[in-house]
Amino acid sequence: GQRVANLATKMYLSDYPDAHEVSRIVAIIQTGSYLHDTIDEKICEDPSKVISEIEELLPKIGFTELEAQDILFTIQHMSFSANIEHHYQLPLSGQYVQDADRIESLGAIGIARAFTYGGKHGNKIYDPKIKPEKLISHDQYRNHVETTINHFYEKLFDLEGLMNTPAAKKEAHRRTEYMREFVQEFMDEWNV
């Protein structure tokens, strides 16, 4: 949504200071940012129907066929789960959308989101008997038993190393350090 679009645009303009904020690539980045969650399997019952609707919409709002292909490829191949078994190389615009979406999972907002998601799905906050797993398949990622603290070790701490762009690498590092401090404090308090 809005934060992903703002962050993706800000990072692109940081990496390309001579670019204009009202350029074609910025329009592609922002459109991809707004559309990226519309086909998320966690919230969308029929992704193929939504993809068809987006395919019809993009030319009507002024995108060329190539630009529309970039947007569609990005939103279909940018998710963490889509890249567990195979890494997809996204167009430059898509790299900024993917990085911004992943950065949303980091830092203070990422911590809040992790605990909100865990609570909503009935996950334990922490259980020392449940060890973090190395996630190697989409099915394992979607179906394994996890705790919220394990989610930091199984996914969130790894996102920093998956960033594509210079500005994202810098921001991801800053937010990951904050999360590491939080998890260390949590473990110190847990083990009193």
Spans of model-derived segments:
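Alpha-helical phosphate/pyrophosphate-handling elements in metalloenzyme active cores
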Residues: G1-I29, E41-K42, L57-I61, A82
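Residue-level detector of well-ordered alpha-helical segments, enriched
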Residues: I25-Q30, E67-I71, G107, F152
